[in-house]
Amino acid sequence: MMDVIRLEGPCEIDEMRVSQLPVPQVREGWMRVRVEAFGINESESHSRRGLSDPDFTYPRVLGIEGVGVVDEVAPGSVFQPGQQVAFMMGGLGREYDGSYARYTLIPERIAIPFTSDLDWATIGAIPEMTQTAYGSLVHAMRARSGDTVLVRGGTSTVGLMAVRLGVRMGMTVIATTRRESARPVPNEAGAA
């Protein structure tokens, strides 16, 4: 058995409880990950309150992103037990149980292997934030090296990631913030 935060239906945040479920069993194309950390996203708040897509069903273990260590794989997997992986989206926490658990079963296609000595709490904040910033720059804006981009909210976590990614990709990045005291923050991250 393992600890999970499983929602039986819509609830307030103070009604969420730790409960027990069996450890999920590996199947072809999927792997079991020991979850070490996960980010908490606004979309999960909508799911918790019953405001998700009509396809979202209860009971459900939330969590659309996470980081951890591969615990078990199916025969023929390209992953190995003990590997560090990040994982996000692809139905995680919506169509099948997510990262608010000690172990989660994920399709291999959403796993991103990495190696890091950073602490798990830091790593756990990176996956979805990075995907959002990257997707905004590259897919939504179609920005490329040499372009100048404006990042509104340049002191938010996603904004700072967009600044860093944009600079690293060869863009000139201009960033805004509402707070005068925070003006140096995006500049320290590389904004012009």
Where are these regions (language model features)?
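Glycine-rich beta-strand-centered segment in the early N-terminal region that forms part
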Residues: P22-G39, L51-L92
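Cytochrome P450 core scaffold surrounding the K-helix E-X-X-R motif
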Residues: S43-R49
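Mid-domain Rossmann-like dinucleotide-binding core that forms the NAD(H)/NADP(H) cofactor-binding site
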Residues: I126-A192
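Short structural boundary motif marking the start of a folded domain
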Residues: M1-I5
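NAD(P)H dinucleotide-binding glycine-rich loop of Rossmann-like/cofactor-binding domains
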Residues: F87-G153
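Conserved hydrophobic/aromatic beta-strand scaffold that supports enzyme active sites
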Residues: V18-V23, V67-V69, Q84, Y103-L105, ...
